[in-house]
């Protein structure tokens, strides 16, 4: 595994980390995200259409205002079982220090049971660009212009 390029402060809020479960980690050399686990006390079944906030068992503090973290779904859970994030993407600001909760939604057609310790989401650290607004009357023309949804076609 490659050497981390950024330090991340983490609080372990669940004593099963380090004993029963490994710390969040990158699964492969080129993984962009660290898997987050369901720090549940007992199995939780999500019926079709149900949503739940699931504790990850950790809190993080990025501290660097040029970074943020995002909680993203795991592709296999979404594709195979319809388990996605209820809020699409969870955005974690650099100054947030509270527990990471995973908004989980069953958009599938069948009930799905999440077991304690299941890897249900992933955490990705991203750089942030903070823009200053410049009010203008018109924009410089671009090839796309104001073309929106579907404007460029599918072929």
Curated annotation (Swiss-Prot):
Q: Does the keyword Metal-binding apply?
A: yes
**What is the catalytic activity of this protein?**
dUTP + H2O = dUMP + diphosphate + H(+)
Under which EC number(s) is this enzyme classified?
3.6.1.23
Cofactor(s) annotated in UniProt: Mg(2+)
A GO term (biological process) for this protein?
dUTP catabolic process
Pathway listed: Pyrimidine metabolism; dUMP biosynthesis; dUMP from dCTP (dUTP route): step 2/2
Annotated residues that bind substrate are located at: 74-76, 87, 91-93
GO MF, one annotated term: magnesium ion binding
Q: Which PANTHER family match?
A: DEOXYURIDINE 5'-TRIPHOSPHATE NUCLEOTIDOHYDROLASE (PTHR11241:SF0)
Which HAMAP family does the annotation name?
Answer: dUTPase_bact
What protein name does the entry list?
Deoxyuridine 5'-triphosphate nucleotidohydrolase
Which organism is the protein's source? Xanthomonas oryzae pv. oryzae (strain MAFF 311018)
